[in-house]
Amino acid sequence: MLNFISKPVGCLKGEITVPGDKSISHRSIIFGAIAIGTSVIDGFLDGEDCIATLKAFQSMGVRIEGPDKQRVIIHGVGKYGLKQPQNIIDCGNSGTSMRLLAGLLAAQQFDSQLTGDESLLKRPMLRISRPLSQMGADVTTQDGKPPIVIKGGKKLNGVHYVMPEASAQVKSCLLLAGMYAEGQTKITENAVSRDHTERMLRTFSYPVQIQDGTIVIDRNGECHGTRLNIPGDISSAAFFIVAASITPDSDVLIRNVGINPTRTGIIHILTEMGADIRILNQRAYGEEPVADLHIRYSQLKGIDIPVSMVPLAIDEFPVIFIAAACAQGKTTLHGAKELRLKESDRIGAMVDGLNQLGVHAEGFDDGILIEGGSIQGGEVNSRGDHRIAMSFAIAGAVASAPVTIKNCANVATSFPSFVTTANMLHFQIEEYS
């Protein structure tokens, strides 16, 4: 078992970059694989989750070179060129891989099966199997959870699906199926979710219409190979945005961070709490907006986090809770029940961990209350969740004594270089088994 010890530090200073965006990296492989022609992707995240997606397409006959220095070269086989995999596709810890692949595989002529690790096998999949079945797909789960068994050769028909809650994974799953369905597939969102798939469709020259919260796609298009630069992942940058905000005298610059407006909830929330975050040198990598982020220490105050921010910061809440633990006053969050269905029950994991470190925190069914103050040293269990592990590593920098975090191996799913990057800013994080 891999564990971290994070020791208190004086201040954090320096300039870093973070690895490529995980959501965009997954999608670059998917669309590159079914494109006509070759795609060159730079800035690819070579974490275990994205490698699971890459290996899935290699098992379906797609030639992919790399990753080599964050570059992958994908020799696309076209929309109808995938071949039946010889084995069950193992998605590891990656819910994104499983849910997006399910949409694509539901439209193929061959049978397939998707499985994953112990954590992934507990995650809900009816949210994709039900709408796929409405389209005519033959998709079965085990009591609503993986593994997923897909019978190929089914004729799919477009549907108009109104999303019951914000979920970029469900939306993307149905858009991928819609690329093969008879007639139009329409997806209406009542709350904003990540729009990387819609942007990626445009990058690969596939026709998609978006109007008044409804996305429309049909099968009358092809993806075409392209060149793509992937920006740094704001979900990875989040750890250092919070760290610089809560560690006195800190001054940190993070370059080349994706600032897609469906992902910048963390910046809005921390700014509302009083953080000093400056967005510099705004530009674009293809369809995705990018900037450099300059963060300096500022005393934070507790707030009631608006429900509208939940889908815009869903992956960043664990480290936002660390910021709340250091703020003056109470912070509350509601409307975030989805946090209980992630790689772990993130509300439960954070409440337990914060209480272990002397912070008063209470969990609700759909949120949390945190009374800010100071963080003590101690030991917490990440429950095998990469974002919980990294969040408590950040807490160690401002704790009164070292913080030990157990069960951190899954940090490699999203941020393999986390400890190295953190220590460049003068963190003191050590790994041990």
From Swiss-Prot:
EC number: 2.5.1.19
Predominant subcellular localization, coarse grouping: cytoplasm
TM helices/strands, residue ranges: none
Swiss-Prot/TrEMBL catalytic activity: 3-phosphoshikimate + phosphoenolpyruvate = 5-O-(1-carboxyvinyl)-3-phosphoshikimate + phosphate
Top-rank EC class of the record's enzyme: transferase
One Pfam short name: EPSP_synthase
The protein, known as: 3-phosphoshikimate 1-carboxyvinyltransferase
Organism: Legionella pneumophila (strain Lens)
